[in-house]
Amino acid sequence: MNVSKVDRKLAIGSSVVFALTLTACGGGSGGGVNSTPPAAPPPVVVTPPPPPPPPPPATSFATAEFNRSDGPGFHGAITAYQAGASGRGVTVGVIDSGIDPTSHEFAGRIHAQSGDVTGAGRVLGDDDGHGTEVTRVIAAAKDDRDVHGIAYNATILALRADQAGSCTTAAPGEDEASCSFFDSAIAAGVNRAVDNGARVINISLGGAGAANTALRSAINRATAAGIIIVVSAGNEGNDVAPKFDPNNPSPFAQALAASGNGLVIIATSVDDNGLISNFSNKAGILQGSTLSALGQSICCQYQNDTIYRFDQNGQTFVRVFNGTSFSAPQIAGAVALLAQAFPSLTGAQIVNLLLTSARDAGDPGTDAIYGRGILDIARAFAPSGTTTLSGTTTVVALGGNGGTTSGPMGDVAMSNQPLNAVILDSYGRAYDIDLAHGLNATAPRLKLTPALVNQGRSVSMAQGTTEIAFSIGAGDSSNAQLAPLNLSSGEQSKARILAGRVSAAISRDTRFSLGIRQAAAGQVAALQGMPTGAFLTATDARMDNGFERAPGQSFALRHTLGIVGITGSVEAGEARLFERSGAEFVRNMQSRYPYALVGVGLDRNIGPAKFALGVSWLREDETVLGARFANFIGQNGARSVFVDGRGDLALVGLWSLGASWRQGWTYANPGASLTGQGVLQSNAFSLDLSRNSLFAHNDRVALRIAQPLRVTRGGLALNLPVAYDYATGATSFGKRQLSLAPKGQEIASEVAWTVPMPGGYFSSNLFWRQEPGHFDNAPDDLGVAFRLQFDF
């Protein structure tokens, strides 16, 4: 049989669109059969387009040439270009009427084995222009002159398959010439493409007859070798007397698909609104193998190797093309881009990618009109399926977050520091990804409101050397009953311990303190006789682990050995972290992760001065100084060492001076990408000045300037995949560090005044937090609080 090219040619001007010529697919088992062009539709008046925008920067792919090119923008090719793909090094076979070898659009990129495959021995050329026009859609050069193709750097294997003379001499009984293509020549072109390393073969031809044995065998051989075939669906959609069913691809396309081992893609045409072109055949029974692409109003006819423009009635026109002939090369160009960008992809994988990434059109899912949908190069280039760090089995969830930092890390999540690594998707494609991009900062700690809100009742008592203090509030009835507090029966059923402490002397030199929901640091300070102050926002450095936590149980024991006190303490509880967003965040939802703390300290009084020095060890099971990172970074917890000191000096006139310092070293445990070799250095400090009986008897005025715990240097040491070799499948790893030191530095200044009153006390606090939460340039937090409390 012979087949014919599938295209239509139009002229388009600034305000008028009209049909100029039309050539439809024809053919059969005998000679070439060409349809008679229908009458041209009447002119359609459209609004003149606005003037073009100013030229974009040279680094932009959206150039004036790009805007003239029909396909790259519509199909999202810029994503591929930004990834460095242009088709370079990929051979695209084009079986058609030949190519203009002198055109600047293909200079230096026409394969040496291009030529006549009919046996006629003709030189490389193109009597009709159809092959050149199709090839421009695939691979016209990006040179800022006219238009450029989808894969503008691809190598072109131009295979001239038109029957000699058919494009220039009209067949008997016909008014004009129409190119004819015999199966034997098409088969020869397919075989030559296979032999010369083509990754994809474009066949913008069609006909009413099925392929012969030689062609079916050639298609089978090519696709068995992993070469993709893209063939036009046909242009019988609006013919009055179609040669074959317009609701299905042409019999020629169906025959190729039947022999194609799943690697034949059939191309239907859509317009630039994504609607099926009225001339296009539909996907029909081969909807699972059909992809729609732009094939309507494709720019432009050339003359003298440039866009042909002509004037008519005072207006300038260009000629554009319609046809599934121009849908197919859009897809072939996309194949070339994928093949260059991801050389390890097989033909089957590329076909599957293009079909499954198509943007839906028509009825939801695959349908009988658009097939799998409209070609979407951007989506085809996006990672697909499960993504993992290259060279590992560690899953990296795209669109997920890299974790949530803690208070001591402040604004580090907003620092935009890159943490690049290579991931592989389910197709084995390598991508460079910034693992730090999804890092979230925890909400700054709320200090004033929790300090003021009292939801329970404070109770304390002392008997000899034993002291008991706790607060109670509403809770569930599963907690222990508290009848000894003389609560009503209703209160007993609802009461739970919010926090409590029992302190007692074991001997003259030894005293212990047992706490429930109380930090061990506070019990240590009480046993040592160190003042803590009545501050709401400025924290004593020794009390500050930096992150939000909920102590569970704690215990401290102090023994006096001569002039020195030795104190040991333990604490277990939960680090709390705001990891959620939206409504869950509004509901104050927090994640909880266990920690344990062990400490030992020394204290001594020297005249009017008191000194304390301590060392503590913090173990976190899943967090790092209160932060929790994604699984691909590591979630094996951390261990920290803190050294802290406190000094208080009683001055003359009831004045006193105090200072605290804490220095920390945190080591993230190895796991996933963490090497365990990084160290975070952190510190906190506070300076106190106070005066008793300043304004009233036994009142106390105190000033504190403090910095909450803050990471000062260091971060996470990571071993990350940094390069991937497609040729060998080998991954190269490199050492990287994610700094966790914030730019901001919170300094909290607070004045507290406490006045005892009969049956209670009155207090007021004035505070000023600069860069609260260690967030650089965050608005200052200013406030004042008043409290009046009575015991009943």
Task: Give the location of each predicted region.
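Substrate-binding/access-modulating region of protease and related hydrolase catalytic domains
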Residues: 26-38, 86-87, 161-261, 305, ...
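Outer-membrane beta-barrel proteins
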Residues: 426-428, 433-463, 497-510, 559-563, ...
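Outer membrane beta-barrel transmembrane domains
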Residues: 531-544, 567, 581-592, 599, ...
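Subtilisin-like serine protease catalytic core
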Residues: 49-58, 78-92, 97-113, 120-182, ...
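Outer membrane beta-barrel translocator domains of Type V secretion systems
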Residues: 442-648
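C-terminal motif of bacterial Sec signal peptides marking the signal peptidase cleavage site
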Residues: 21-24
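Extracellular S/T/G-rich loop segment that most often corresponds to the catalytic His/Ser-adjacent loop
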Residues: 96, 253-336, 340
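C-terminal subdomain of the subtilisin-like protease fold in secreted/lumenal serine endopeptidases
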Residues: 64-72, 76, 191, 200-202, ...
